[in-house]
Every structure is written in structure tokens, then in C-alpha cells.
């Protein structure tokens, strides 16, 4: 059973609000729900082009439901700053917290482990602690903490599709280890302090205004410059690509259904905790994905019609920390929230290519 939450007239904290997923979520909520106040937090770091984050954040500020004021306030800051987080929670009574702030990137974590520990573990701990203290003095407290995990926690899992019931005790990257740590910490806080927590394992998110370090975006940048793109594991990689609108739809449905608070037969609280995959459920071979991407880039006018694709592809070995396949079993999400991702690769890449053409024309 889930405790139903109506998003109208709610105070919501979204961390990572200028990030790919955070901005798309913020804009969707502001356009569809009345009386909502969103506090968006982001450190706006330079892991990738800060101008893209500014672009997303401007879209956050302008997003609104017709006839209603925009209820968005932006705070530039790092959730690893405990004083900042504590002050936010003291100033605002949050009904729902969505923690999307994190240092992303599997390969980047190999050479920069410190920033992952700071943001993904210390930062998340600060959020958990702040949520815990919203219950002080018998107050109602945060009704639901939703946080981002990742498909990377599955590591080299041989069983497909990946289920949340599968053991994930052997991460192959530091990024994955921090995300698994988030799940463990959230479960502990749900058990000890009865905080309703739901973790979401996202599978290879793509779409307009995405992260330039993601394969589809970086490949587009390189192709546009006439450079060669590397396709890992000699093309024998499959990814469960999931379009951003499907990810956001999944998050919004989950936000509105918190794990129920109840007691077990021993009279002790059962942790109000849940974990779901959000993935398309249709792994795509990278070579096929690239072919579709190139076709849509030509269609959008990003690449010329006579572009020599084969001259700009190079098959290379698997990279450290990478895995050959990701494949989501999202039946739990369908069972509990009635939702399954629906947007196919060609439709999603077409929307990305059209956005890319418009964005870089605007930037020129």
C-alpha cells in the first residue's frame, strides 16, 4: 500500500534542480500543479558546460501553469554544505524532498573520487539528517523523500533483466558504490526514524538539454566537428536508453505514492522504504543506436545529408568501470504506479536532434 500525496499546494525541495533530470522535473511540476512552491538547489559546478545549466535554470524560472504565479526559488549551493542544508530546512517546511544532486559519471569517478564522496555520500547524509529533524517535537515531518540511485549499481550482473531483487554487492565503479551507499543509508533512516524513502534506479537517461558527457550528446558534438566517435566493446554493448520524459513521469508518480508507515507483528515499525528501476526495458545495441542518432541529426540539419558516417566511427575495447549491458526490469513500477516507459529510441533521438539544432543555433 502507498500513502497518497497530492502535489497541489505542496512545498517541494529539488536538489540538482539545474541538472538534466532535476530541471525537467521542476518544469513539469510547475506547469501542471497549482499552488506548488519548489526550492531548487544546485552548485552549478563546471563538470560540464555551466551555460547549459544556466539555460535549464532559466527555463525553470519561466515555467508556470497558465494563470498562476511561478513558485520557484533557486539557491546556488552544495548539499555537502551542512549549514546550507540545515538552514534551508529551518526556513522551509518541505512536504516532499527529491534528491537528484550528485556528481555523475562513471569514468570521471576513477580519477576524481573525492568529489563523489563529498556530493554523493556526505551531501546525501546531510539531506537525510535534515529530513530526520523535520520530525522533531512530534511534527508531521517530510512526507516523502525520493532520491536518485542508478543502474550502475548492478555492475557486471549476468542475470538480465536487472531486478531490484538482484544482489548488488560488487560495484565496478566508485560512482556505483556511492549510489549503493545511498540506498543503504536511506533504508537505515527509514528503519530508524520512520522516514518514507523511495530510491529510483535510472537507466541511461537521454533527451533534450541532457548532459554533454553522455554518449549520445558527446557523439553528436564530435560528429558535428568532424571528429571520430569511439564505440566501446567493439560495438557489443547494449544500453537500456530511457527518454527524459519517461523518467520524469516515473518520478512524479512515485512522489505521489509514499511507502506506507506501519508496524510488523513484533510491534516495531516496518521501514517505509521502496526501490524501483525506471528503464525502457528494451536494450539497444550501440551500433544501431548510433545509426539512428546519425539519421536524426541529418534530418534535423545538424549534419549534412552526405555525411560519411563510417569514416567517423571507431570500435574500441571496453573502458574501465563500464559494463556490456544494462536492462531494466521495471515491473515493480508498473505494478505499484501503473507506469511503464513508452517513448522509443527514434522518437526520443528525433526530439534531441531538433533541440540540439535549435539550442546551438541560439548559442551561435
Each language-model region and where it sits:
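Generic recognition of short, well-ordered alpha-helical segments
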Residues: 24, 87, 108-111, 122, ...
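A glycine/serine/threonine-rich, flexible loop-to-helix segment
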Residues: 160-161, 212-220
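N-terminal Rossmann-like NAD(P)+-binding domain of SDR-like oxidoreductases, especially those catalyzing
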Residues: 1-205, 292, 359-362
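C-terminal substrate-binding subdomain of Rossmann-fold SDR/epimerase-dehydratase oxidoreductases
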Residues: 1-5, 9, 28, 70, ...
Amino acid at each position: 500500500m502507498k500513502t497518497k500525496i497530492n502535489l497541489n499546494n505542496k512545498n517541494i525541495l529539488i536538489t540538482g534542480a539545474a541538472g538534466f533530470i532535476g530541471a525537467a522535473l521542476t518544469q513539469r511540476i510547475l506547469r501542471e500543479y497549482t499552488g506548488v512552491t519548489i526550492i531548487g538547489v544546485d552548485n552549478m559546478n563546471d563538470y560540464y558546460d555551466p551555460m547549459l545549466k544556466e539555460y535549464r535554470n532559466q527555463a525553470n524560472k519561466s515555467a508556470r501553469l497558465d494563470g498562476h504565479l511561478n513558485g520557484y526559488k533557486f539557491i546556488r549551493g552544495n548539499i555537502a554544505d551542512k549549514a546550507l542544508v540545515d538552514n534551508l530546512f529551518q526556513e522551509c517546511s518541505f512536504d516532499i524532498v527529491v534528491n537528484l544532486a550528485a556528481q555523475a559519471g562513471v569514468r570521471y569517478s576513477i580519477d576524481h573520487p573525492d568529489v563523489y564522496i563529498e556530493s554523493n555520500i556526505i551531501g546525501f547524509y546531510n539531506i537525510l539528517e535534515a529530513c530526520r529533524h523535520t520530525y522533531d517535537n512530534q511534527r508531521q515531518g517530510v512526507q516523502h523523500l525520493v532520491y536518485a540511485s542508478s543502474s550502475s549499481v548492478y555492475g557486471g550482473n549476468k542475470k538480465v533483466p536487472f531486478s531490484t531483487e538482484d544482489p548488488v554487492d560488487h560495484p565496478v565503479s566508485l560512482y556505483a558504490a556511492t549510489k549503493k551507499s545511498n540506498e543503504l543509508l536511506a533504508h537505515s533512516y527509514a528503519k530508524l526514524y520512520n522516514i518514507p524513502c523511495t530510491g529510483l534506479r535510472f537507466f541511461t537517461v537521454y533527451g533534450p538539454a541532457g548532459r554533454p558527457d553522455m554518449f549520445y550528446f558527446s557523439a553528436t558534438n564530435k560528429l558535428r566537428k568532424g571528429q571520430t566517435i569511439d564505440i566501446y566493446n567493439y560495438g557489443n554493448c547494449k544500453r537500456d536508453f530511457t527518454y527524459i520524459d519517461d523518467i520524469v513521469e516515473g518520478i512524479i508518480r512515485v512522489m505521489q505514492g509514499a511507502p506506507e508507515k506501519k508496524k510488523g507483528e513484533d510491534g516495531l515499525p516496518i521501514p517505509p522504504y521502496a526501490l524501483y528501476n525506471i528503464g525502457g526495458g528494451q536494450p539497444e545495441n550501440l551500433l544501431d543506436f548510433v545509426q539512428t542518432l546519425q539519421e536524426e541529426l541529418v534530418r534535423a540539419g545538424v549534419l549534412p545529408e552526405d555525411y560519411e558516417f563510417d569514416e567517423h566511427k571507431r570500435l574500441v575495447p571496453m573502458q574501465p568501470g563500464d559494463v556490456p549491458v544494462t536492462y531494466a526490469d521495471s515491473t515493480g513500477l508498473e505494478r505499484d504506479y501503473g507506469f511503464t516507459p513508452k517513448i522509443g529510441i527514434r522518437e526520443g533521438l528525433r526530439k534531441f536532434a531538433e533541440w540540439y539544432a535549435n539550442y546551438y543555433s541560439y548559442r551561435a
